[in-house]
A protein has these predicted regions:
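Basic, polyanion-binding surface patches
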Residues: 1-200
Length: 200
């Protein structure tokens, strides 16, 4: 099949784009506002951009379809200049899904999802205590994309890794089984890996 994205004339029941760009790691973004209220939400347009210095980025759309209003995560990052990213393991998939709901500013996603938060060391934002890996980030830039989304770029200033997932000097993702976003309502669990040597 062939279709143009300007018209989206694919003829399918659902737009296949998110299923094509998959699997995508999930950034569990934790922020805090100037009043000390925390926010937690998952974002699947997320990835590392470079490793020296470590830079990550994630895309944030409007809070609701048809409403051009930024999500709490983006508003808090603009206000404080920092945030944390926690990686979602298979064991935390249900809590992550709960935190994806639309809640009033006064409600705490950590409490709603039954999670605890740990205080950041280099940033004011907390991170998910139960997560296998968390990154503390300082805002580097926010880029306005075509349409209604923003691309948030963060400099990673500190890394938290639970010791039980470091095996023989390497982070073993098969031990904590991170989940990834696919298309539609689909997710995947990373449970099997293999190595390939680069050509010399």
């Amino acid at each position: 099949m062939f279709y143009t994205t300007e018209v989206n004339d694919h003829g399918l029941k659902y737009n296949p784009f998110k299923a094509i760009v998959a699997p995508r790691p999930i950034a569990w973004i934790s922020t805090i506002d100037n009043e000390g209220r925390t926010n937690l939400a998952p974002y699947s347009f997320f990835n590392g951009m470079q490793d020296s210095p470590p830079i990550i980025g994630f895309g944030s759309g409007p809070s609701k379809v048809g409403i051009d209003e930024p999500k709490d995560s983006l508003s808090n990052i603009k206000a404080t200049g920092n945030f944390c990213v926690s990686i979602v393991s298979e064991a935390l998939k249900n809590q992550m899904n709960i935190s994806s709901g639309h809640f009033p500013h006064s409600e705490n996603e950590y409490e709603i999802a039954g999670l605890t938060q740990s205080k950041g060391v280099t940033v004011s934002a907390p991170f998910v205590t139960e997560a296998p890996v968390s990154l503390e980030c300082k805002l580097h830039d926010i880029i306005t994309l075509p349409g209604t989304s923003k691309w948030v770029i963060g400099l990673v200033t500190a890394v938290h890794i639970k010791d039980e997932f470091i095996i023989n000097g390497k982070l073993d993702i098969t031990k904590y089984r991170p989940i990834a976003r696919l298309g539609y309502k689909d997710y995947a669990t990373i449970s099997q890996v293999y190595e390939l040597d680069r050509p010399k």
